[in-house]
Amino acid sequence: MSALHSIPHRSKKLPPLRVGVGGPVGSGKTTLVEMLCKSMRERWDLVVVTNDIYTKEDQRLLTVSGALEPERIMGVETGGCPHTAIREDASINLEAVDRMLAKFPNADIVFIESGGDNLAATFSPELSDLTIYVIDVAAGEKIPRKGGPGITKSDLFVINKTDLAPHVGADLAVMEADTQRMRPAHASSRPYVMTNLKTRAGLAEVVSFIERRGLLHAA
């Protein structure tokens, strides 16, 4: 990992970009955050806030994987419904973000990983500037056409674990067609990406989306 002083920080005319990563339990949110950190940490100054209901397991997993230095990863225990902590009452996460930015004032990006939740989960605009919603193919071919704010309103929709399609009888072409129908503006304002994070397939597209839509190269 490069020394942080050598990283070209985002223009300080702009506040840190806050990227919310949501999705059901087991969809691959933590793996995506891990791989985003490892792909982007040479170029950008990163910190992470993870959410779990009763533990700090995702913080532990990211730390063990070496995604970032341990002090750059903070876990919060939300209790109750995980969507409440990112939407109706985001105070616990807002406080965590403030604490991380006090420790790392040059941070360019704050990744906020929600606890696993249902298709209705969304991030408060006070907490997240960009939202990424992750589902996995193993949950069923029907998931994209079920709709819900995570699928229809997220800035980027990620269909993960594409390698499992033949094992669960899912047709990726059907999932893609349903996604295009549920996200009619997908080609411009609401894109989607098919990923297999085991092989890094699709990861570069997610990174490019964050850098482009997050104005990370703005002067």
UniProtKB/Swiss-Prot annotation:
Transmembrane segments: none annotated. Coiled coil: none annotated. The keyword Zinc does not apply. It holds the Pfam family cobW. It comes from the Bacteria. Keywords: Chaperone, Cytoplasm, GTP-binding, Nickel insertion, Nucleotide-binding. CDD domains: UreG. GO terms for molecular function: GTP binding; GTPase activity; nickel cation binding. The keyword Nucleotide-binding applies. InterPro entries: CobW/HypB/UreG_nucleotide-bd, P-loop_NTPase, UreG. GTP binds at G23, P24, V25, G26, S27, G28, K29, T30. Its main location: cytoplasm. One of its GO terms (biological process) is urea catabolic process. It is found in: Cytoplasm. Residues 1-20 are annotated as: Disordered. GO terms for cellular component: cytoplasm. Signal peptide: none annotated. Facilitates the functional incorporation of the urease nickel metallocenter. This process requires GTP hydrolysis, probably effectuated by UreG. Homodimer. UreD, UreF and UreG form a complex that acts as a GTP-hydrolysis-dependent molecular chaperone, activating the urease apoprotein by helping to assemble the nickel containing metallocenter of UreC. The UreE protein probably delivers the nickel. NCBIfam families: ureG. Belongs to the SIMIBI class G3E GTPase family. UreG subfamily. PANTHER family: UREASE ACCESSORY PROTEIN G. This is Urease accessory protein UreG. It comes from Methylibium petroleiphilum (strain ATCC BAA-1232 / LMG 22953 / PM1). The gene is ureG.
